[in-house]
Swiss-Prot record:
The active site is at E143, E236. This is 2-epi-5-epi-valiolone 7-phosphate 2-epimerase. Keywords: Isomerase. The keyword Transferase does not apply. Disulfide bonds: none annotated.
Length: 270
């Protein structure tokens, strides 16, 4: 099966329909959309908006790969259920309306997992949310920077075949973890889409893929032979400065990596 190359809406200068059209213009196969919210753009669950975005994507020939609930980093996934559950329900409903296969729930800033209490609350929130996702035929993925033992515990406590972990090729580095090590240790539980970046820095003009300190090549090599093949390599370097040359260079790098992923998968089948 083809390994696609995609973009993340929240790391581009334009948003919404314009971001989808940009993805088509630069030759990306797909795009992950952000749900929006204060300081994050127009909410995708506004009247008619999801349908409009889906129509634009169909017309442009761009796959809608995932929906990310980045506003949870502002609200806090560890907030009381009365606060977080309505947001998770809106995310699941919107993901269904968009027709995406993956819903991303991040655990950074106010959603960071920093102690036993935040871990317990995160597991409870994800367990509640994954029941909604599973009923809709959607995979729910947690993006976090837990070490392997705690990440495995999270998978066990959520306890659903519709739950996965989302691998980022640089975020763990900022927390003293090696993404290639994580890729190997947590191999059975990764979602089939991966965020590619190779900082530092995490924001602003970041190193081109393969030229930074993240060791993105080692991480992708470590994923070879995973039970679940990688279906999408998604760029998450910061392109909000509108520097098209960097975006195109990273797309070309990712395209070569996607070809390698396909060849690796063929090797498993022969």
């Amino acid at each position: 099966m083809t390994c696609r190359v995609g973009l993340t809406e929240w790391r581009l200068a334009p948003s919404g329909a314009a971001a989808i059209r940009l993805a088509a213009a630069v030759g990306a196969d797909g795009i992950q959309l952000d749900f929006g919210g204060p300081g994050r753009g127009v909410l995708v669950d506004g009247p008619g908006r999801a349908g409009q975005l889906r129509a634009v994507a169909d017309e442009a020939g761009v796959d809608l790969l995932a929906l990310a609930g980045n506003l949870l980093n502002d609200i806090g996934l560890t907030s009381q259920p009365a606060v977080v559950q309505p947001v998770l329900a809106r995310l699941a409903d919107t993901a269904t309306e968009l027709g995406v296969p993956l819903l991303i729930v991040p655990s950074f800033r106010r959603s960071a997992i920093t102690d036993a209490m935040s871990f317990t609350r995160t597991a409870a929130a994800l367990r509640w949310a994954v029941s909604l996702a599973e009923a809709r035929g959607i995979v729910l993925a947690s993006e976090n920077v837990l070490p392997p033992a705690r990440a495995r515990q999270l998978v066990e406590e959520v306890g659903s075949p519709a739950f996965r972990l989302l691998l980022d090729t640089f975020n763990p580095v900022r927390y003293g973890l090696d993404p290639a090590w994580l890729a190997t240790e947590l191999r059975p539980w990764w979602a089939d889409q991966i965020h590619l970046k190779d900082g530092p820095p995490d924001t602003g003009p970041s190193p081109l893929l393969g030229a930074g300190q993240g060791g993105v090549r080692r991480t992708l090599t470590a994923l070879r032979g995973s039970p679940a093949p990688v279906r999408a390599l998604v760029l998450e370097n910061d392109y909000r400065d509108g520097h098209g040359a960097r975006l195109r260079a990273d797309l070309e790098w990712a395209r070569r990596a996607a070809v390698n992923a396909r060849e690796s998968e063929k090797g498993k089948l022969t």
